[in-house]
Amino acid sequence: LPADERIQRLRADRWIGYPRAVEALNRLETLYAWPNKQRMPNLLLVGPTNNGKSMIIEKFRRTHPASSDADQEHMPVLVVQMPSEPSVIRFYVALLAAMGAPLRPRPRLPEMEQLALALLRKVGVRMLVIDELHNVLAGNSVNRREFLNLLRFLGNELRIPLVGVGTRDAYLAIRSDDQLENRFEPMMLPVWEANDDCCS
């Protein structure tokens, strides 16, 4: 291969299926196939920065890609990034943007909430993944409480698994709410080490 092509290949993302990553994918598949019920199980994927959490989510999302037929979009796995501060309105904006929904200027929260719920159902979202969930701790206590209440509301209303992804701060945020702590099963991703698990 020419040098520039080799360089491009070296810079590209690479999936490394070390055992804990494969275990995380299997856990996501189990949740994805979970039958609809009143209280769905959720997952909290926790690990240090630059440890492959988002790559695991991207690999899973590609396994269940969005599609469209006629005038209908299908988005079985929706991945949304938590805004830099835990504002309910900003989260709904991010959620609607991830679904490609047009937003009118200065929408009111009740309208955004109803639109988001309607679209999540319409496009057939079966799992909602919230990346960078540790950003919940960036806000004040009132904003944090409102956002954690929103997570509970979405879980109850949609009856789909929620997956939080983030650093240890995400775990601390979820633990600050007794109900959410019972609903989110933490799965820790260890720090990368040069051992047999990571060698091919």
Residue ranges, per PLM feature:
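A short helix-turn-beta junction within AAA+ P-loop NTPase domains corresponding to the substrate/partner-engaging
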Residues: 175-191
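Conserved NTP-binding/hydrolysis module of P-loop NTPases
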Residues: 77, 83-104
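Post-Walker A helix-loop "phosphate-sensing" segment adjacent to the P-loop in P-loop NTPases
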Residues: 62-73, 101-102
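A short beta-strand-to-loop transition that corresponds to the Sensor-1 phosphate-sensing loop
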Residues: 132, 164-170
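Conserved small helical "lid"/interfacial subdomain of P-loop NTPases
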Residues: 190-200
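A short, basic N-terminal segment
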Residues: 1-41
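Walker A/P-loop nucleotide-binding motif
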Residues: 37-59
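Mid-core helix/loop region of P-loop NTP-binding domains shared across ATPases and GTPases
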Residues: 1-2, 25, 87-91, 103-161
